[in-house]
Amino acid sequence: MKIAVDVMGTDYGPQELVLGAVQAVRAYDCEVVLVGDSEIIKKLLEEYNAADERKITVHHSSEVINMDEHPGIAVKAKKDASIVVATKLLRDKECDALVSSGSTGAAVAAALFGLGRIRGIERPAIATPIPSLTGTTVVLDSGAKVDAKPEHMVQSAITVSYTHLRAHE
């Protein structure tokens, strides 16, 4: 599995995300694409003795969407933001998954604009997998929307069913 990681959107800088990626590729059978300012990322990889780690690649992006920016406006304006670039990698099948610790709103907006929606689904939903002794349960939205209408609840049920089925193919 190849995972794109938006390392620039977080409040605390890319250090922990780059370190986590290094630890992940050394412990698990995965590859990681670090998306963000390549100069900063490469310096961190050197610091963590991972500059030659072949399961890590760096994909440069020159912009960042900050937590205080309006997600939809920022995603449209900042075409080279790390979350937008990472979403394009996912859309173009250059990775299998995407992780971001940045603005949730920006991640959702980038996914909506870059990946689209399931036909008939009006509102996106955030899925939270919860591991348990008997398997994994997926909770949709986890309190993110307080104004959901009945039709949105039905659409959320469809979305979580689709997500669960795709995850277990």
Regions found by a protein language model. Give the residues of each.
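Short helix-capping segments at alpha-helix termini
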Residues: V25-Y28, E46-K55, R166
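Conserved small/polar residues in nucleotide/adenosyl-binding loops
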Residues: T163-E169
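Phosphate/nucleotide-donor binding subsite
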Residues: A50-C95
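Short, glycine-/small-residue-rich phosphate/pyrophosphate-handling segment
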Residues: P131-Y162
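Short beta-strand segments
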Residues: D6, V35-G36, H59, S100-G102, ...
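N-terminal phosphate-binding or glycine-rich loops at protein starts, especially the Walker A/P-loop
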Residues: M1-I40
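Short glycine/serine/threonine-rich phosphate/pyrophosphate-binding segments
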Residues: G13-L17, S82-I83, T104-A111, K149-P150
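Short, acidic/small-residue loops that bind anionic groups at enzyme active sites
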Residues: A110-S142
